[in-house]
Amino acid sequence: MDSSCHNATTKMLATAPARGNMMSTSKPLAFSIERIMARTPEPKALPVPHFLQGALPKGEPKHSLHLNSSIPCMIPFVPVAYDTSPKAGVTGSEPRKASLEAPAAPAAVPSAPAFSCSDLLNCALSLKGDLARDALPLQQYKLVRPRVVNHSSFHAMGALCYLNRGDGPCHPAAGVNIHPVASYFLSSPLHPQPKTYLAERNKLVVPAVEKYPSGVAFKDLSQAQLQHYMKESAQLLSEKIAFKTSDFSRGSPNAKPKVFTCEVCGKVFNAHYNLTRHMPVHTGARPFVCKVCGKGFRQASTLCRHKIIHTQEKPHKCNQCGKAFNRSSTLNTHTRIHAGYKPFVCEFCGKGFHQKGNYKNHKLTHSGEKQFKCNICNKAFHQVYNLTFHMHTHNDKKPFTCPTCGKGFCRNFDLKKHVRKLHDSSLGLARTPAGEPGTEPPPPLPQQPPMTLPPLQPPLPTPGPLQPGLHQGHQ
């Protein structure tokens, strides 16, 4: 039994070093208390690369910004992995991991230095204060995969870089050239404006960036070239804004405007709504009827203006004859009567008119065609307007009544003509036609002095019955 215990003890002592070696070679746990409580060292600011030193102003101290800084910084695109060429035997997510761990210099441009994603991000953060004064000249890089590129742009294309399509074949990992565009507002503060550019199939949606040369450093550009690029970029930006604000849904800006032609008279309109309002001229439809006088109108707005006629307010008065009107436009037309101005002259008979409406109605009398006919008495008219008022004669609807004799009329015009011809002439107050120039109203009748009657005499006493004695005595 002692021998068996001795053998067991020997085996335990022999396996103890092996177990110690296994424990020492095991990986440390990611959630260990020591790693959690350990203080994370702050990242060191990288020195400025030599190819960026020429673009920075000298004489000013540089303050490095760390990744955990609270100061916001504008990055031209979301950081992605950069790689010069796909490595053989590496597939899936390994190229991205390999490029992050060991960045290599670009093979196409041996003189251009390469930096990893963290280097570019650290440089952009450290040079954030100089972005408003100088452009960052970046060299050529290659995107690992196309993706949406979000960045905040500056005024007039800004000091950040724009991406354009490369000259190589369309491949997910093909080269994407990055070139700087000088900012027109170098001394102005940065105003972020969110924009999104889509990098799909190696084609970035950037308008007309092919006009700028790719792969040109900022220090190699002359002042004239910078001024040219600044003006051109501002012009491109204004054209882009004008194109977005233009009415793109209605067609191209260079397209001819749509016209709507009336099939009856050939009149042209720029909108279909105006053509619809014009068609009742030919159809004769007047759906808007005045409830006071029964006059019909093609438009509701005309009916609203017509209703002012039936009101008692007439603020616009003629200075020559004292006649008052509801609207100033009617007064202006009335002044043509006193001036004898008749701009609308009939080309058939030479008769002049003060108003265009009366001129059009008169021209229809020369046509000889009366297409609007009454169904009751077969009387024809040139206009449907006259036929509408003629129908009142058959239904005994006469809204205008003479206050003197009580006779009714269909139109107010007929009532005024009746009063002027009959009642004014009977009272001796007939008016002269106002249309004839140089006519004056008749002078008033001379006033006669009042008649004076002689004073009244007292009446004579009536004689009484004669007495016989007195009568005989006189004899």
Swiss-Prot record:
Domain of life: Eukaryota
Gene3D superfamilies: Classic Zinc Finger
Motif Engrailed homology 1 repressor, chain ranges: 28-43
Pro residues: bias regions: 439-466
Zn finger intervals (C2H2-type): 260-282, 288-310, 316-338, 344-366, 372-394, 400-423
Keyword ATP-binding carried by entry: no
Tissue-specificity statement: Expressed in brain. Little or no expression in other tissues. Overexpressed specifically in gastric cancers. A 2- to 20-fold increase is found in over 50% of gastric cancer tissues.
Entry keyword annotation includes Repeat: yes
Keyword annotations: Developmental protein, Differentiation, Disease variant, DNA-binding, Hypogonadotropic hypogonadism, Kallmann syndrome, Metal-binding, Neurogenesis, Nucleus, Repeat, Repressor, Transcription, Transcription regulation, Zinc, Zinc-finger
Molecular-function annotations in GO: DNA-binding transcription factor activity; DNA-binding transcription repressor activity, RNA polymerase II-specific; RNA polymerase II cis-regulatory region sequence-specific DNA binding; zinc ion binding
GO terms for cellular component: cytosol; nucleoplasm
Signal peptide residues on this chain, from the entry's feature table: none
An annotated GO BP: negative regulation of cell population proliferation
Chain spans, region Disordered: 428-475
SMART domains: ZnF_C2H2
InterPro entries: Znf_C2H2_sf, Znf_C2H2_type
Primary localization class, coarse: nucleus
Compartmental location: Nucleus
Additional notes on this entry: Triggers oncogenic activity specifically in gastric tumors through activation of KRAS in the ERK signaling pathway.
Family according to the record: Belongs to the krueppel C2H2-type zinc-finger protein family.
Disease cited in the entry: Hypogonadotropic hypogonadism 22 with or without anosmia: A disorder characterized by absent or incomplete sexual maturation by the age of 18 years, in conjunction with low levels of circulating gonadotropins and testosterone and no other abnormalities of the hypothalamic-pituitary axis. In some cases, it is associated with non-reproductive phenotypes, such as anosmia, cleft palate, and sensorineural hearing loss. Anosmia or hyposmia is related to the absence or hypoplasia of the olfactory bulbs and tracts.
Role description: Transcription repressor. Involved in the axonal projection and proper termination of olfactory sensory neurons (OSN). Plays a role in rostro-caudal patterning of the diencephalon and in prethalamic formation. Expression is required in OSN to cell-autonomously regulate OSN axon projections. Regulates non-cell-autonomously the layer formation of the olfactory bulb development and the interneurons. May be required for correct rostral migration of the interneuron progenitors.
Protein name per its UniProtKB record: Fez family zinc finger protein 1
Organism the protein comes from: Homo sapiens (Human)
